[in-house]
Amino acid sequence: MGRSEELFERAVKRIPGGVNSPVRAYGAIGMAPRFIKRADGCHIYDVDGNEYVDYIDSWGPMILGHNFPQIREAVVEACADGLSFGCATEIEVEMAEFICEHLPHVEMVRMV
């Protein structure tokens, strides 16, 4: 039994269906889901050491691939100020303005 199978057996005891999204359940495939440890570029690596080409891209947000250096650096820089405040921030205003300026049909933005 591989590490992914071991993790899945543990997960089903504490997480409904063993995964936090029905699409991750691999039900139609008839096998335990792969548990991913890391990713780089267009590749993901499971806890068993297998390498896969990532055609899922986290269902959209990883369009530039995983661990893209400029994005990683920007995230590290942003984290230095804190992660989540539960209050309004200047960068929210800047992001909303950027979106509205670049998508003329969008008048307002709400980020949740």
Where do the PLM segments sit?
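Active-site and channel-lining beta-strand-loop segments
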Residues: 34-54
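Fold-independent oxyanion-binding glycine-rich loops
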Residues: 19, 47, 59
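Glycine-rich loop-to-alpha-helix module at the N-terminal edge of alpha/beta enzyme cores
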Residues: 51-112
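Active-site-adjacent loop/helix segments that line or gate small-molecule/cofactor pockets in enzymes
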Residues: 1-38, 92, 98
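Short, flexible segments with low predicted structural confidence
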Residues: 15-16, 46-47, 70-71
